[in-house]
Curated annotation (Swiss-Prot):
Pathway info: Cofactor biosynthesis; riboflavin biosynthesis; riboflavin from 2-hydroxy-3-oxobutyl phosphate and 5-amino-6-(D-ribitylamino)uracil: step 1/2
E.C. numbers: 2.5.1.78
Active site positions, chain numbering: H89
Function: Catalyzes the formation of 6,7-dimethyl-8-ribityllumazine by condensation of 5-amino-6-(D-ribitylamino)uracil with 3,4-dihydroxy-2-butanone 4-phosphate. This is the penultimate step in the biosynthesis of riboflavin.
Gene3D superfamilies: Lumazine/riboflavin synthase (3.40.50.960)
UniProt record similarity statement: Belongs to the DMRL synthase family.
Name used for this protein in its record: 6,7-dimethyl-8-ribityllumazine synthase
Quaternary structure annotation from Swiss-Prot or TrEMBL: Forms an icosahedral capsid composed of 60 subunits, arranged as a dodecamer of pentamers.
UniProt-recorded Gene Ontology molecular function terms: 6,7-dimethyl-8-ribityllumazine synthase activity
Length: 157
């Protein structure tokens, strides 16, 4: 039986990390986790990592699509934080960011790793940005690395 399974090391991969500036005090930790995972676990060279900053999570899909369209990247990691407030704004932003990034991934033919926190409160966001619940930026980066390798294996199979 042939089993295809992605590995985490991707030393030659070119990865874009796109991050929302809104809630930067959380997102900066997500970026730190993602870049650390790319370099330490994935063995990605510093010069092969591009960091792109957008105003907020709603703008992530457009920037990710444009980066994918350049065909210069093997994967893109999208990072941001949307915290529920007292209005319906949370549902719109979180839903559009999620849906938009999923559409880009399917249409661009490269992995788009979803590292957007959608939390009820700031405490949950902090926990997921490197404290109690790990670092979701690092997790998204590892998803991107694994998918780069897996898609290469599928192509070669």
């Amino acid at each position: 039986m042939k089993i295809l399974e992605g590995k985490l090391a991707a030393p030659e991969a070119k990865i874009a990390v796109v991050v929302a500036r809104f809630n930067h005090f959380i997102n900066d930790s997500l970026v730190d986790g993602a870049v650390d995972a790319l370099k330490r676990v994935g063995e990605v060279k510093d010069e092969n990592i591009t960091l792109v900053k957008v105003p907020g999570a709603y703008e992530l899909p457009l920037a990710v699509r444009r980066l994918a369209d350049t065909q210069k990247f093997d994967a893109i990691v999208a990072l941001g934080t949307v915290i529920r407030g007292g209005t319906a704004h949370f549902e719109y932003v979180a839903g559009e960011a999620s849906s938009g990034l999923g559409n880009v991934s399917l249409n661009a033919d490269i992995p788009v790793a979803f590292g957007v926190l959608t939390t009820e409160n700031i405490e949950q966001a902090i926990e997921r940005a490197g404290t109690k619940a790990g670092n979701k930026g690092a997790e998204a980066a590892m998803v991107a690395l694994e998918m780069v390798n897996l898609l290469n294996q599928i192509k070669a199979a």
